[in-house]
Amino acid sequence: MTAIVGFDQLSKALIDAGTNLLSPPSSTDDLLTLLDETESLLKNVEQDQPLSMQSALIPSRNALVSVDLLSHPDSDVRVSVVSCLTEIVRITAPETPYSDDLMKEIFRLTIEAFEKLADASSRSYKKAEFVLDNVAKVKSCLVMLDLECYDLILQMFRNFFKFIRSDHPQLVFSSMELIMIAIIDETEQVSTDLLDSLLATVKKENQNVSPMSWSLAEKVLSRCARKLKPYIIEALKSRGTSLDMYSPVVSSICQSVFNTPKVHSPVNTKEHEEKLDLGHSRKENLSKSSSKRPARHETRGINEKEKVRNGNKSSLLKQSLKQVRSESTDAEITGKRGRKPNSLMNPEDYDISWLSGKRDPLKTSSNKKIQKKGSGGVSSLGKVPAKKTPLPKENSPATSSRSLTGSLKRSRVKMDESDYDSDSLSSPRLKKLASCFRDEEPNQEDDRKIGNSSKQTRSKNGLEKSQKTAKKKPVVEAKIVNSSGKRLSARSVAKRRNLERAPLDTLVPQSSKRKKMVSQVAARQLANESEEETPKSHPTRRRTVRKEVESDGFGEDLVGKRVNIWWPLDKTFYEGVIDSYCTRKKMHRVIYSDGDSEELNLTEERWELLEDDTSADEDKEIDLPESIPLSDIMQRQKVKKSKNVAVSVEPTSSSGVRSSSRTLMKKDCGKRLNKQVEKTREGKNLRSLKELNAETDRTAEEQEVSLEAESDDRSEEQEYEDDCSDKKEQSQDKGVEAETKEEEKQYPNSEGESEGEDSESEEEPKWRETDDMEDDEEEEEEEIDHMEDEAEEEKEEVDDKEASANMSEIEKEEEEEEEDEEKRKS
């Protein structure tokens, strides 16, 4: 009951304090006293407060951002207001309590409050020290990156170097160090001004002038060495300055070769610490100060005695975990930090034990914070409170920046794909964070099983491909093959579904070929990747690593062939044509159906060869289980031409499909023949009209004659078209009759055969039926080829007849024109 009463009393006291702040007293001393009372009440509020406590905080939250308090003329009042506001930010973390504009104003006042650290005798010094420690623990400074307050960040760095003194406690030094390291680690691009302030502080001429700022800058540079190395080298080259002008830390950073640490591997703590300090004699360990802090600043869930005993190990672990995050900046993308407000704000890292003495030490809001963020933004490893986790072990120097893979984004840098074992992650927060890593990169485990750690990337066309993903047309990979290699009807069903699901603006493929899967893998490892690569500003896509097969014969033989290229990120095939092959690079140039092109090493890709050139319409008609019987087609033709063609053959399940496909092929040949005849006739008529216009004079009478001739030509063309259509129909009927006669010869007495087949089916084995089906298919293909040859011959005959008819018509027209001219002249 005492806890409940205390909770109610705290809520009531907060409401009264907020109400009083809404109408602040005119006296500065009374206002400072009221702000101190409000701050002490806010310190007793934990993060996971119930709804009643949230309601009790509303008056204070609104009163603290009033114009009267934020713009108060007394600087001590403003510092007290900032101290209360930092508590509000801590309570609501990781969510911001105010709008962006108000948060910018709060950060401006916070940096102004840091100026009070310059005078330890001032009234607001303790408040400024408390604000600094609170910002470092909660990491609310990272919200300034989200709000793009780069000027405020630069001013804060300069103030830290300006106001740090030797008489400051270790808490001030360590808090400044934590804030600066967090800012550098989480920014996507280190600004030139920020780097200049660091380098200017570690100049040798400033070592004796301001030794504390020198030491602070050295600490920050050594802790962020991997992140700052490319920027430092570029700055020194552009200015032409020598390394002798700066601290030995700068030269050590430029000459060092960084290795990729692995979280689950132990390391010697002494050697690791020596590498980070880079031989510097001044070793100010952060853990010594953290172990001496009051109980309110300790991490929840860890015994206070254990923290004092294991302070050094904990600080080194934090240091190594932050290096895991900072080492991935070799492939960093330049630009602004992605806007993820408050996602890096730490929850409260200390326990408020005096509110109710029965609080569970393991209760924290970190799990809730991770669930809220989801996949939108996972905080980096450097922000996880360090516990008894094994320290990282460095790899061999041959490790390159390409080994830093993964799409886990905070500042859009690539993380190491090392496996975070559950045994090595003792704290629940680290375990949850490792599970988020595994969810983000499910393909890394498959790549490790295959044993190929090299990642195939395409930086040339990667950005264009990612932008055109929605425009590319998917290719259906549904293939159902029986024992004889014949495709079944399920393929056509998959095509229909694909056409139904395709959007209206997507180009539906007009040709669906028989595909032959060719799965390949990279045959060699990337052995010369020890050098660090330049940061790239465009994304890359990885190819799925497949099992290794023989790659011989995939050179110039594939030029001109149609293939399907697998895109693992899109999880689909994209159709294209192999345009050329480079023997020197052993690369094929593939032109996709949407016009895009790229060079690929097909031995390292997953792709399919499209062998068959038949159209999608023909495949659909052939694969349909319900085909039109031959008798129905013959009857339709008999009605049209009034010819008696006796057809007594009823197709069985297999012969019916073959006969219907033959008839459909015949129809398609006839359609193509009609189109070609019409094109040739139109072309010849146009040529004849041009000749007539060239021969005639440019007189009005001759123009009238040409118009009359054109009208006559049109009537004659219509008559000629009717004659040609009759001839074509006759030729088609002849072909069908010849076909039916051949079938009658091959299958006489179809009824007897059907009965015989029923009896033979009981005796003959199944393998014989499959052989017969294969023989029938071969005969069918030969018949189709023969029919196509006949169609070509008929086409040539029709062309000859048309040519002779056109010549005779032209001669007649010329004679008639000459006679008309003679009559007119006479």
Curated annotation (Swiss-Prot):
Locate the compositionally biased regions of type Basic and acidic residues.
269-286, 296-309, 437-450, 665-701, 725-746
Record keywords: ATP-binding included?
A: no
Q: Where is the composition biased (Acidic residues)?
A: 702-724, 752-763, 771-800, 811-826
Q: Name one GO biological process term.
A: cell division
- Annotated segments matching region Disordered: 261-551, 640-826
One GO CC term of this entry? nucleus
HEAT repeat positions: 18-54, 55-94, 151-188, 189-226, 230-267, 424-461
**Which segment of this protein is annotated as the motif Nuclear localization signal 1?**
281-288
Lineage: superkingdom? Eukaryota
| Residue window of motif Nuclear localization signal 2 | 357-364
Record key words, sorted = Cell cycle, Cell division, Coiled coil, DNA damage, DNA repair, Mitosis, Nucleus, Repeat
Write out the transmembrane intervals: none
Q: Does the keyword NAD apply?
A: no
Phenotype of the disruptant?
Weak impact on meiosis such as formation of some chromosome bridges at late anaphase I and telophase I in forming pollen, but severe effects on development, fertility, somatic homologous recombination (HR) and DNA repair, especially in plants lacking PDS5A, PDS5B, PDS5C, PDS5D and PDS5E.
Record Gene3D superfamilies: 2.30.30.140
Compositional bias per record (Low complexity), positions renumbered to this chain: 644-663
**What's this protein's function?**
Cohesin cofactor dispensable during the meiotic division but playing an important role in DNA repair by homologous recombination (HR) probably by helping SMC5/SMC6 complex. Regulator of sister chromatid cohesion in mitosis which may stabilize cohesin complex association with chromatin. May couple sister chromatid cohesion during mitosis to DNA replication. Cohesion ensures that chromosome partitioning is accurate in both meiotic and mitotic cells and plays an important role in DNA repair.
What is said about its interaction partners and assembly? Interacts with the cohesin complex.
Into which family does the record put it? Belongs to the PDS5 family.
Q: What is this protein called?
A: Sister chromatid cohesion protein PDS5 homolog D
Organism, as annotated? Arabidopsis thaliana
